[in-house]
């Protein structure tokens, strides 16, 4: 037993040493923080050079760009207006007023419902009857 305990302790000590080695590696490898100051300086230089170029031409860069964008938008809007359909060409006789599409066949729904009721295929309040029966069955199940 004593030998087994010694072996276990030796293994534990070895595991602890490996953990320490891993933590040392992590601390030795320092992460460098990115330095964006150089990039910021380059960007500001580019912006200044653009402003001086646009200043020499006599226009501000932002104004000329916005004017170009406005012109593009105006042309796009005019193209959309040309592409829109003319509503005067629509024949109003083809518009369905009832709200139900029947593919050109005119159906009197009241008459059709009466005919079906007379034939006994459906009752006029069929949906309500089914709901009431379901409710009665459900109530009976839970009364126990």
UniProtKB/Swiss-Prot annotation:
UniProt GO cellular component terms: nucleus
Bias type Acidic residues, positions: 125-144
GO MF assignments: histone binding
InterPro entries: Histone_chaperone_domain_CHZ
Similarity comment: family membership: Belongs to the CHZ1 family.
Gene (UniProt): CHZ1
Biological source species: Vanderwaltozyma polyspora (strain ATCC 22028 / DSM 70294 / BCRC 21397 / CBS 2163 / NBRC 10782 / NRRL Y-8283 / UCD 57-17)
UniProt keyword Chaperone, yes or no: yes
Coiled coil: none
Identification of the protein by name: Histone H2A.Z-specific chaperone CHZ1
Protein task: Forms a chaperone-bound H2A.Z-H2B complex that acts as a source for SWR1 complex-dependent H2A to H2A.Z histone replacement in chromatin.
Origin: domain of life: Eukaryota
């Amino acid at each position: 037993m004593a030998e087994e305990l010694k072996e276990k302790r030796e293994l534990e000590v070895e595991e602890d040493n490996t953990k320490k080695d891993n933590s040392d590696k992590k601390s030795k490898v320092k992460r460098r923080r990115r330095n964006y100051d150089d990039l910021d300086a380059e960007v500001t230089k580019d912006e200044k050079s653009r402003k001086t170029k646009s200043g020499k031409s006599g226009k501000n860069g932002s104004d000329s760009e916005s004017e170009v964008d406005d012109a593009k938008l105006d042309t796009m809007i005019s193209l959309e207006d040309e592409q829109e359909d003319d509503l005067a060409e629509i024949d109003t006789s083809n518009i369905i007023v009832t709200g139900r599409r029947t593919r050109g066949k005119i159906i009197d729904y009241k008459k059709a419902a009466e005919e079906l009721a007379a034939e006994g295929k459906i009752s006029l309040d069929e949906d309500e009857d089914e709901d009431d029966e379901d409710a009665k069955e459900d109530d009976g199940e839970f009364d126990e």
